[in-house]
Amino acid sequence: MAGARAAAAASAGSTASSGSPPPQEPGLWELLEEFSRTQYRAKDSGGKSGSKVERIEKRCLELFGRDYCFSVIPNVNGDICGHYPRHIVFLEYESSEKEKDTFQSTVQVNKLQDLIHRSKMARCRGRFVCPVILFKGKHICRSATLAGWGELYGRSGYNYLFSGGADDTWASTEDVTEEDFVLRSGDTHLFDKVRGYDIKLLQYLSVKYICDLMVENKKVKFGMNVTSSEKVDKAQRYANFTLLSIPYPGCEFFKEYKDRDYMAEGLIFNWKQDYVDAPLNIPNFLTQSLNIDWSQYQSWDLVQQTQNYLKLLLFIMNRDDDSGLLVHCISGWDRTPLFISLLRLSLWADGLIHTSLKPAEILYLTVAYDWFLFGHMLVDRLSKGEEIFFFCFNFLKHITSEEFCLKTQRRKSLPTRDAGFTVEDICMLRHKDRGSTTSLGSDFSLVLEHSPGAVGSFSYETVELAPAGAPTQAAWRKSHSSSPQSMLWSRPQPSEERLPSHHGLTEAKSSSSSSSNHSDNFFRMGSSPLEVPKPRSVDHPLPGSSLSTDFGSWQLVSGCGSIQDRPVLHTDSSLPFSFQDELPNSCLLTALSDRETRLQEVRSAFLAAYSSTVGLRAATPSPSGAIGGLLEQFARGVGLRGTSTSTL
């Protein structure tokens, strides 16, 4: 545990070592202070707090307007929903001329508003299906789960159903079955009516996939079923949708995350609890292309579970159809914003949405819109230690790898094989694969391709190495462009895989590829240091390298390290590579990618702002003080704070 805490502290301090604070969004600290002080309510628009909320709302509209043409659905005073934004943004199309011609919404806002008003009572707390992300013309939506009879009738009568959901208290109701109550009410068509409008809204938004994060089939409160879900609708009203039951722990579980000094690795949910009755259920056509053993989901820790669910959601959105996606939990303000935020940030990091926003700006938009304005109760969660909000942005370090990337790679003559590698991977070839820049008698193909934003790549355009048996030649063509590039290598799969066992090496598990599928494509163990050119000395290693040593005019970088400077190769020189006899059939070693850089900047900006406003609450005093001083160390290192004034 102490080692894990030290690693976390080192991660936070890596940016601090650069001596410059991460870029900050004006107003982010004010947003976090307001967020940690009170829960947002659409009807509370007066006074000092109201002016702050107005600034937050205005800033969100500005940030959406950078890249999208959108309409605003008014929710003044919470007329539609008391804990949805007062200005609900409906994204119509990207404002760039290219994207405008490619994807354009066919939704009429007036009709959408009408369906929203009619369908709002169908879902828990009036939290209707709301589109929040536009990707390739498809809407990613959020909502609460379906309201059960207990909510429909058990609050303050029918008046509540049309009041905008201002009253969140639960009323006592006789514990009878849903069927009995419907018969007693004399309105046997009530569920057909309200859920029928909900279905019409989903269809109007072209939503086909519904992802249910609940660990229960129905939420039981005060001895009665207060909510339901699409997967247990007795009338099978949602049979035409693709329903996915992907149970994920509720906010209560994140108290254990906090009590473990904010370490998610090794934290496994107890699936044997009495109230947990919703098994994982995903259609086969969605799982066949993902190298994940879904039958083992109950053995995944929090990191693996979150990673695999995010991969599934990204895969669904990247399918070649026009179908949208709905993500929901029970109330839709804890687990739902977690995955909506991760989807938004992951797609942004790939340059696929919000393309003009900087890291600090996308962070502000995500915190403000996905969490604050959609009613996450941060004050209550902090008081209980249920820090799912902090987990979300701290988790970005686990999704930096290319396995989460949806950006299409532009390849030049790459054989159809599984693994992709950078130039460093040549160093990992077996002895029989050794060669030079002019003659390589090996059994692999190598292609250099553009990888926008990659750090430390060669400024050469093409390298092609032919398979064994053919005349082999590698030509380096110097490029006038400064755009970064990467190198991909694939070779036949051997019948057996063995990880190398080298004396004196330490195990290094990549936090961004700790998925439970144990894919062969991803590096997991430390390997012998490999040589890469070092044109000049480097004072500070890049974050992510586990071993870095200077050796003459070369720099030794471990298998999971990154090239720290742009190396220079000459056309008349041999590649200064060393090889190993026994290595895994495939592994992934990358320079710091554009995706990783962007997500790291978002996470760093969040930690800096969070440390100065909210701060971490240590569960128990730690002798090492590692977690207690995690954010404090970060803030001091980047010059954000002189002396501590709050308890972290």
From Swiss-Prot:
Q: Does the keyword Glycoprotein apply?
A: yes
Q: Which residues carry this modification: N6-acetyllysine?
A: K193
Please name the CDD domains in this protein's record.
Answer: PH-GRAM_MTMR14
User: Could you tell me where the Low complexity compositional bias lies?
Assistant: 1-19
| Positions of a 1,2-diacyl-sn-glycero-3-phospho-(1D-myo-inositol-3,5-bisphosphate) binding | G332, W333, D334, R335, R381
**Record key words, sorted:** Acetylation, Cytoplasm, Glycoprotein, Hydrolase, Methylation, Phosphoprotein
| Modification Omega-N-methylarginine occurs at | R636
Where is the region Disordered?
1-27, 471-544
List, alphabetically, the PANTHER family matched.
Answer: MYOTUBULARIN-RELATED, MYOTUBULARIN-RELATED PROTEIN 14
Q: What is this protein called?
A: Phosphatidylinositol-3,5-bisphosphate 3-phosphatase MTMR14
